[in-house]
């Protein structure tokens, strides 16, 4: 993934976040015979032909479980998600390679396979247990998003009412243990105070696996400039998400209106399963889709504030329904790179954005492990 690109070469992508495992669970209870990932599967945003078309050479597969699952149920469901990623790679062994290290990623790409890594989404998946964290690392997890849409006992979520104002002492211990094990601390979804506390505590690069720039779209899931400005000192990477709510203020406002409707009906605006039907019900009121240029604006803003070495891509495909026109699935990355090339990005710049920066951060994270 580190070879020199020419203007004609596809830009290799190591994407930070894809929710295909949960989509397959919901669609067919993990039955790989019931889904057409080789021929092309229109019911999802990710399949093998479209990964190839998008230049995706590596993917962090999210092993997300919803916050409605707690305690042992959340832990069990996360193990089931991890097991699915193992089975996915074993089933499509000619196309995918399960990876645990940056060296593994390089080896997979050298054989023409998509490097497949595991990312956990939400601290509820470990049930406040460092033992569970260690076990999931042993099973291949290489990042943990500290929260999802709801607070955990040791960290505040960006989309919940703050309780702690940041990380508790257990939360700080979680960050330190992740550093020791060799796992990325993922700060997407967390409250601003958690971002700042984690950057203070972490002795290894952090990532935002799927977040965009708050200066351009005022959404709590996006990253404020003062936090982006800390990434050079930490070595971390903000991997820009392509979800419409994060790229366009008009879309963010439409989303917030749906949250208000959910609350007025006695539903939980933090829960996707409560909000998604309202979004679909109100789809006729949705703004025009964001553009590829909107996605490029966020990438360029992160570059301007944090520096070229600290920006990547984390599409969040199969984790959302709304994306820029032309980038509705994993085949769309080349359109982003074409737009950035038009704006003056060099082939070397694009190689860093697509995969080089997160691989460098991964090597640094591994070196910091004990």
Task: Tell what function each PLM region has.
Residues 114, 175-183:
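Short, surface-exposed connector motifs at secondary-structure boundaries
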Residues 4, 202-204, 213-215:
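Charged catalytic cores and adjacent phosphate/nucleic-acid-binding surfaces used
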Residues 165-176:
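Active-site glycine-rich loop that binds ribose-phosphate moieties when present
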Residues 129-133, 194-204:
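Distinct, well-ordered alpha-helical segments
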Residues 96-99, 183-190:
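Catalytic beta/alpha-barrel core
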Residues 13-20, 190, 208-212:
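Histidine-centered catalytic micro-motifs
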Residues 1-167, 218-370:
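N-terminal hydrophobic targeting/anchoring segments and the immediately downstream early-domain regions
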């Amino acid at each position: 993934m580190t070879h020199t690109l020419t203007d004609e070469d596809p830009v290799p992508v190591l994407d930070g976040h894809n929710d295909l495992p949960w989509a397959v669970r919901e669609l067919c209870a993990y039955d790989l015979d019931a889904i057409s990932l080789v021929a092309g599967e229109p019911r999802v945003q990710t399949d093998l032909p479209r990964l190839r078309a998008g230049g995706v050479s590596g993917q962090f597969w999210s092993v997300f479980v919803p916050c409605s699952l707690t305690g042992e149920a959340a832990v069990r469901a996360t193990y089931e998600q991890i097991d699915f990623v193992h089975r996915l790679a074993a089933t499509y062994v000619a196309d995918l390679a399960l990876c645990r290290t940056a060296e593994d990623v390089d080896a997979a790409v050298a054989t023409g396979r998509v490097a497949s890594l595991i990312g956990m989404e939400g601290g509820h998946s470990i049930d406040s247990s460092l033992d569970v964290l260690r076990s999931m690392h042993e099973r291949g997890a290489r990042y943990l998003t500290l929260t999802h849409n709801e607070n955990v006992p040791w960290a505040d979520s960006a989309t919940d009412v703050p309780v702690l104002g940041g990380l508790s002492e257990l939360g700080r211990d979680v960050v330190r243990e992740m550093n020791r094990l060799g796992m990325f601390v993922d700060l997407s979804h967390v409250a601003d105070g958690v971002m700042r506390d984690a950057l203070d505590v972490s002795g290894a690069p952090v990532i935002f696996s799927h977040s965009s720039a708050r200066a351009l779209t005022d959404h709590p899931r996006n990253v404020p400039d003062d936090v982006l400005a800390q990434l050079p000192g930490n070595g971390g990477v903000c991997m820009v998400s392509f979800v419409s709510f994060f790229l366009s203020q008009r879309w963010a406002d439409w989303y917030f209106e749906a949250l208000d409707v959910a609350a007025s009906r006695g539903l939980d605006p933090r829960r996707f399963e409560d909000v998604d039907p309202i979004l679909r019900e109100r789809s006729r009121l949705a703004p025009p889709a964001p553009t590829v240029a909107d996605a490029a604006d966020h990438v360029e803003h992160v570059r301007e504030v944090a520096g070229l070495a600290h920006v990547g891509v984390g599409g969040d495909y199969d984790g959302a329904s709304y994306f820029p026109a032309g980038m509705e699935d994993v085949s769309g990355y080349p359109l982003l790179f074409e737009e950035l090339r038009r704006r003056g990005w060099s082939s070397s710049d694009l190689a860093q954005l697509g995969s080089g920066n997160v691989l460098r951060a991964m090597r640094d994270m591994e070196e910091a492990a004990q």
